[in-house]
A protein has these predicted regions:
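Residue-level detector of beta-strand structural context in well-folded domains
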Residues: 23-25, 101-103, 122
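Residues that act as N-cap/strand-start positions at coil-to-secondary-structure junctions
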Residues: 19-21, 93, 99, 118
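Short, exposed beta-strand/loop patches in secreted or surface proteins that constitute
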Residues: 1-3, 26
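Pre-active-site segment of Zn-dependent metallo-hydrolases
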Residues: 10-57, 90-91
């Protein structure tokens, strides 16, 4: 696990059937840490998670990012958070907190509902009003499967066969341009640490 930005840590797993890394994030907030889409860490990474306790919430951005969430929940006793429209699709996983567009997770992470890949796909905007690092960095946006960083240095959508409704997803993504952000953190593929909004705008202009 490494600190990608002050108070924001990442680690990843590689799978033979995907040409990109699957990334998890640990976000330190006032008095707690929130995990997002956590994959299995390397065995020698576990002590790093103990350092950033208490881990109070684990966020799933979509139904396909269950990954190692139950291992983390059992180890740290964290509440599991997911989009309200994703809860049924996540069964038999039990969701402790269902969130909707505009909700704040842990008082700082603003929920952006991005339906299309799946009904409850969501992104997280690090609200600059409540998150000092986001304010200093020009805004931070985190996405699950709505956009991926593949190939490295570029943005793309996941394969069409994995999308519930491709036209709806493309419409949903337009709302990202309503937010001010420079950093784009991605749970699939390579993050963009500078010029993130410009890169998203350029990518959206390529979509039919």
């Amino acid at each position: 696990m490494r600190e990608i930005l002050p108070g924001i840590f990442t680690w990843g797993s590689t799978y033979a059937d995907r040409p990109w890394d699957l990334n998890g994030y640990a976000i330190r907030l006032d008095g707690c840490t929130v995990l997002v889409d956590p994959p299995a860490p390397a065995e020698d990474d576990w002590p790093s998670f103990d350092v950033i306790k208490p881990i109070t919430k684990i966020v799933l951005t979509n139904r396909d990012h269950i990954r190692d969430v139950e291992v983390f929940r059992a180890r740290f006793g964290a509440h599991l958070v997911a989009g309200a429209d994703e809860v049924k699709q996540l069964a038999p996983i039990t969701i402790d907190e269902a969130v909707r567009e505009g909700d704040l997770i842990a008082g700082a992470l603003h929920v952006i509902h991005l339906p299309g890949k799946s009904a409850g796909e969501m992104g997280l905007y690090f609200d600059p009003a409540y998150h000092a690092i986001s304010r200093e960095m020009g805004g931070i946006l985190l996405l699950g499967d709505a956009i991926i960083g593949n190939p490295p240095g570029a943005l793309s959508l996941i394969p069409e066969l994995k999308l519930d409704d491709s036209p709806r997803l493309k419409r949903s993504l337009r709302k990202l341009l309503d937010y001010d952000f420079d950093v784009l953190l991605l749970c699939d593929g390579q993050a963009v640490l500078s010029g993130g909004k410009r890169k998203v705008a350029e990518f959206l202009n390529t979509l039919a």
